[in-house]
From Swiss-Prot:
It comes from Methanothermobacter thermautotrophicus (strain ATCC 29096 / DSM 1053 / JCM 10044 / NBRC 100330 / Delta H) (Methanobacterium thermoautotrophicum). GO terms for cellular component: cytoplasm. The gene is argJ. InterPro entries: Arg_biosynth_ArgJ, ArgJ-like_dom_sf, ArgJ_beta_C. Keywords: Acyltransferase, Amino-acid biosynthesis, Arginine biosynthesis, Autocatalytic cleavage, Cytoplasm, Transferase. It catalyses: N(2)-acetyl-L-ornithine + L-glutamate = N-acetyl-L-glutamate + L-ornithine. The lineage of its organism: Archaea, Methanobacteriati, Methanobacteriota, Methanomada group, Methanobacteria. This is Glutamate N-acetyltransferase. Belongs to the ArgJ family. It comes from the Archaea.
């Protein structure tokens, strides 16, 4: 899948030397800190017209291409909170700055949780102070950070890789993320913080991050709702070799791994699935078809019900806007242990009484399923990620205050 060797390692954001992290939680509220003083940075933010106050603040903070700290809280989104909400976001930055002897203009702020309620700022400031006293460069510190920013997540999400740049120098990327519900392009209800040691300017990091986000988080659909607080930030110590194509490929791999974790952790999820659209006429066609299939409520419910309903898959491809000949489409279902072609160049193979249908039904009982759709229209491909739509999803969101 990748043109170079990637070694997955432990450590999350702290896999990069010099990066400090910490996380504290008290009840439903948590605070995570990442310290990377004077780092080169770039970010991608939600495209929702309703934007949370920390998103607005961090856009300004990161505009000069450098940050020293990231503070993120869970339990309150600080969105639709007006001037008071912006004051609260600034107080978070100020508390970090005071605790760590830096300027508040160097502090990026992120929030996730309930929309439309004032931040319990005194509690958040207390948690910031507590986290600041626990900062260290360790696997445990990154893990505490990942846990502190969880909301409806059921497990913390971290990944780190080591790889060689084209010069032969070793480089690293580490990351944490949160996200399980309200996930749809563009981006997802998610926060992700990425660290690296590659030598790159802010504009170079921005370009690489946008490509990686587009090929990963923007191809992830849990429930089709787009958040007000989405944020992906990358910061670099610039202590390794120059940015190159190997770094860009590794960054895509890291973001895709986080996206897969989020798909597995969608609210109420019992199964996750990957949609690979191959042999499309254009890359955009491949992406449109993959997104449509991964986002289809009918496909999601078929996954939940272990129903190999190929009709829902081809219907979603058909309304996606991708150009292809329906009489040439092929569909394959795969699990870790077996694979079956259910539609072959427009011919239905999986119908009542066939071995193909029996195999397809077994595949659909797997916890992780791969759907391969061959459009037979070119040589472009794309991958999207999704999860099933369950009774528990409805229950969780019926009981959760927006």
């Amino acid at each position: 899948m990748y043109t170079m060797e990637l070694r997955f390692i432990r450590g999350g954001v702290c896999a990069v030397d010099g990066v400090l992290a910490a996380g504290c939680r008290e009840g439903k509220y948590g605070v995570g800190l990442i310290i990377n003083r004077g780092s080169t940075a770039a970010a991608v933010f939600t495209s929702n017209r309703v934007r949370a106050e920390p998103v607005k603040l961090t856009e300004r903070v990161i505009a000069d291409g450098s940050i020293s700290a990231i503070v993120a809280n869970s339990g309150n989104a600080n969105c639709f909170t007006g001037r008071e909400g912006m004051d609260d976001a600034r107080r978070m930055a100020r508390k970090v700055a005071e605790s760590l002897s830096m300027d508040e203009s160097e502090v990026a702020v992120a929030s996730t949780g309930v929309i439309g309620r004032r931040m319990p700022i005194d509690k958040i400031e207390f948690l910031i102070q507590s986290a600041a006293a626990q900062l260290e460069n360790s696997e445990a510190a990154s893990g505490a950070l990942a846990e502190a920013i969880m909301t409806t997540d059921t497990f913390p999400k971290e990944v780190a890789v080591e790889f060689e740049l084209e010069t032969g120098e070793k480089a690293r990327i580490g990351a944490v993320a949160k996200g399980s519900g309200m996930i749809a392009p563009n981006m997802a209800t998610m926060l992700s913080f990425i660290t690296t040691d590659v030598d790159a300017s802010s504009s170079e990091l921005t370009e690489a991050l946008r490509v990686a986000v587009d090929e990963s988080f923007n191809m992830l659909i849990v429930d089709g709702d787009e958040s007000t607080n989405d944020m992906v930030i990358i910061s670099s110590t610039r202590t390794s070799g120059r940015i190159d194509s190997n770094f860009r490929e590794a960054l895509v791999a890291v973001c895709r791994e986080l996206a897969r974790m989020m798909a597995r952790d969608g609210e109420g999820v019992t199964k996750s699935f990957q949609v690979d659209v191959v042999n499309a006429g254009t890359h955009e066609d491949a992406k449109m078809a993959a997104r449509a299939i991964a986002g289809s409520s009918l496909v999601k419910t078929a996954i939940f019900g272990a129903d190999p309903n190929w009709g829902r898959i081809v219907a979603a491809a058909g309304y996606s806007g991708a150009e292809f000949d329906p009489e040439e489409i092929s569909v394959t279902l795969e699990s870790d242990s077996e694979s079956v072609v259910i539609v072959d160049h427009g011919d239905i193979l999986a119908f009542e009484g066939t071995e193909e249908l029996e195999t397809a039904e077994r595949v659909m009982t797997s916890k992780e399923i791969r759907i391969i759709v061959d459009l037979a229209a070119g040589d472009e491909s794309a991958t999207a990620y999704g999860c099933d739509l369950t009774y528990d999803y409805v229950r969780i969101n019926a009981e959760y205050t927006t």
